[in-house]
């Protein structure tokens, strides 16, 4: 996986969830915050980050920084997916399939944010099992990472793209 430095202005950033958590100590509770964010260039690059801090802005900033560092490339096909894909992380399972032009992003919550910043414009998606945002985001990114273009499959098998597509 190659890491390409991008200017912050070129990336779309989305905040998915902010959560207040507490640690109980002898003197009472210590509150801190967690933030889940996704960033993408709208053209097949996407990453997510999870930041924790005592203040909300600091948690968001940490999450954005981690997301920028952990970006992956997604092989898109004219604004949709190459083929139907499944992904899972702990109790969350996701299923995504390509859709025709004009369908839009039919996906819920955390999945929608990931697909929007990745540059997917037409997709049908469903999350099963746990809808915990962190696990849904991890499952979605795992599914997108597993997706292969016909060119990638052809290169791996040592065949032509026509042979792979059956033309």
Swiss-Prot record:
Residues 11-74 form the S5 DRBM domain. PROSITE patterns: RIBOSOMAL_S5, S5_DSRBD. The N-terminal domain interacts with the head of the 30S subunit; the C-terminal domain interacts with the body and contacts protein S4. The interaction surface between S4 and S5 is involved in control of translational fidelity. Keywords: Ribonucleoprotein, Ribosomal protein, RNA-binding, rRNA-binding. This is Small ribosomal subunit protein uS5. Transmembrane segments: none annotated. Part of the 30S ribosomal subunit. Contacts proteins S4 and S8. It comes from Yersinia enterocolitica serotype O:8 / biotype 1B (strain NCTC 13174 / 8081). PANTHER family: MITOCHONDRIAL RIBOSOMAL PROTEIN S5 (PTHR48277:SF1).
